[in-house]
Design a protein with these regions (language model features):
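Conserved positions in beta-strands of structured domains
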Residues: 17-20, 87, 101-103
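Hydrophobic beta-strand-centered segment that forms part of the acyl-chain substrate-binding groove
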Residues: 60-99, 132
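Extracellular/lumenal ectodomain signal focusing on beta-strand-rich modules
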Residues: 18-21, 83, 130
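Short aromatic-glycine motifs in intrinsically disordered, low-complexity regions
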Residues: 1-10, 72
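HotDog/MaoC-like acyl-thioester-processing domains
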Residues: 28, 60, 91-92, 101-142
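Hydrophobic core residues within well-ordered beta-strands of beta-rich domains
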Residues: 13-15, 96, 110
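Compact, glycine-rich, soluble single-domain proteins
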Residues: 42-61, 78-79
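Catalytic strand-loop segment that frames the active site of acyl-thioester-processing enzymes
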Residues: 10-46
Length: 142
């Protein structure tokens, strides 16, 4: 599924190509890293790009969940990023794959765990980052 309507970012700053909802608590997103990506330095896609990809993946998943359950997408914010482990960088031509799992929902706060891996081909996938995030959904703009 395309994510362009689920996140506030617009080209050229979209860092998620596709999303597959696996269950109400789990999704998988992908991003093909292209030369034109604003967060690429030459052919290098580093920590800031990977973290932005994770954040947009989480936002797309929460937006999709909100749309399915409430019929609309609410504005939201990242409330916390913790335990961010950056293990390796990626390069143009690689595909980032991120698994997002909701661990807790308490009112307007959703806690997620994210695991991101990179592959240059289907048989060569390795982890590049993981973290925990808390996202706040702002329903005050009803």
């Amino acid at each position: 599924m395309k994510t362009i309507g689920l996140i506030p970012q617009r080209p050229p700053f979209v860092m998620v190509d596709d999303m597959e909802v696996i269950s109400p608590e789990h999704c998988r997103t992908t991003l093909l890293i292209k030369d034109a990506n604003l967060l690429c330095d030459e052919t290098f896609f580093g920590e800031s790009g990977v973290l932005e990809h994770i954040a947009q993946s989480a936002a797309a998943f929460i937006g999709d969940k909100s749309l399915r359950e409430e019929g609309r997408i609410w504005p939201g914010y990242i409330g916390e990023i913790k335990n961010f482990n950056f293990l390796d960088s990626a390069k143009t031509g690689d595909v980032l794959t991120t698994e997002i799992r909701i661990t807790t929902i308490f009112g307007d706060v959703t806690a997620i765990e994210a695991q991101t891996s990179v592959s240059s081909d289907a048989d060569n996938q390795h982890p590049v980052a993981n973290c925990v995030m808390k996202l706040f959904v702002d329903r005050s703009h009803a």
